[in-house]
Amino acid sequence: MIGKVAGILDFRGPDHVLIDVRGVGYIVYVSDRTLASMPGLGEGVALYTELVVREDLLQLFGFPTMIEKEWHRLLMTVQGVGAKAGMAILGALGAEGTARAITLGDARSIQAAPGIGPKIAQRVVLELKSKAPALMAMGGGTAALAPSEPPEPEPGTSSGSRRKTRAPEPPRPSHTADALSALANLGYQPTDAAQAVAQAAGESPDADTAALIRAALKLLAPKS
């Protein structure tokens, strides 16, 4: 299993990149969102990867964060959602947006992804809604890849010919996991807590953990 590829960006296609790792080129399929965040050709890049195996084809799919990779895996468990459809959803919404849409039952947002029809979008929401809280709670430990040191130059090459490897710019740190943990400690059910936190995050994208908890508690409070 190839879980990470780090090297030099050699080529950019419409839906994939070619990463040179010590002279071996890896074709990695990425979402539109990830492709837009790629550095220039000849610069270093690192992606978490998922190897998708079919009868006559092996394909690598790349992600800037581990949480996005895990969401891709989960999306592919839904009948009718293949690897590229999963990438389309993540490309349109991002990992946090996907989590929020599924948790809130917002099939319309899922349907906004290219190639995703209303039936598939509804199926994604229905099948994954109960699984979303556990994955959302992973958010704190699945940050984007940090810059890494370049590999040692091969014999006969100059050290200056290899640039520092780095990941695409990471998204804003998520406070979702900490808010979910706090609500769980207060005795709220995971599904209820996830829905409240997702709604709070959607209404206040820049909210920190404390603000998310306060907003979620208001949403969870009994209606008079």
UniProtKB/Swiss-Prot annotation:
One of its GO terms (molecular function) is four-way junction helicase activity. It is found in: Cytoplasm. Residues 1-64 are annotated as: Domain I. GO terms for biological process: DNA recombination; DNA repair. The keyword RNA-binding does not apply. One of its GO terms (cellular component) is Holliday junction resolvase complex. Its main location: cytoplasm. Residues 65-143 are annotated as: Domain II. Keywords: Cytoplasm, DNA damage, DNA recombination, DNA repair, DNA-binding. Residues 141-185 are annotated as: Disordered. SUPFAM superfamilies: DNA helicase RuvA subunit, C-terminal domain (SSF46929), Nucleic acid-binding proteins (SSF50249), RuvA domain 2-like (SSF47781). Residues 171-224 are annotated as: Domain III. Gene3D superfamilies: 5' to 3' exonuclease, C-terminal subdomain (1.10.150.20), DNA helicase RuvA subunit, C-terminal domain (1.10.8.10), Nucleic acid-binding proteins (2.40.50.140). The keyword Cytoplasm applies. InterPro entries: DNA_helicase_Holl-junc_RuvA_I, Hlx-hairpin-Hlx_DNA-bd_motif, NA-bd_OB-fold, RuvA, RuvA_2-like, RuvA_C, RuvA_C_sf. Residues 144-170 are annotated as: Flexible linker. The RuvA-RuvB-RuvC complex processes Holliday junction (HJ) DNA during genetic recombination and DNA repair, while the RuvA-RuvB complex plays an important role in the rescue of blocked DNA replication forks via replication fork reversal (RFR). RuvA specifically binds to HJ cruciform DNA, conferring on it an open structure. The RuvB hexamer acts as an ATP-dependent pump, pulling dsDNA into and through the RuvAB complex. HJ branch migration allows RuvC to scan DNA until it finds its consensus sequence, where it cleaves and resolves the cruciform DNA. HAMAP family: DNA_HJ_migration_RuvA (MF_00031). Homotetramer. Forms an RuvA(8)-RuvB(12)-Holliday junction (HJ) complex. HJ DNA is sandwiched between 2 RuvA tetramers; dsDNA enters through RuvA and exits via RuvB. An RuvB hexamer assembles on each DNA strand where it exits the tetramer. Each RuvB hexamer is contacted by two RuvA subunits (via domain III) on 2 adjacent RuvB subunits; this complex drives branch migration. In the full resolvosome a probable DNA-RuvA(4)-RuvB(12)-RuvC(2) complex forms which resolves the HJ. Belongs to the RuvA family. Has three domains with a flexible linker between the domains II and III and assumes an 'L' shape. Domain III is highly mobile and contacts RuvB. This is Holliday junction branch migration complex subunit RuvA. The gene is ruvA.
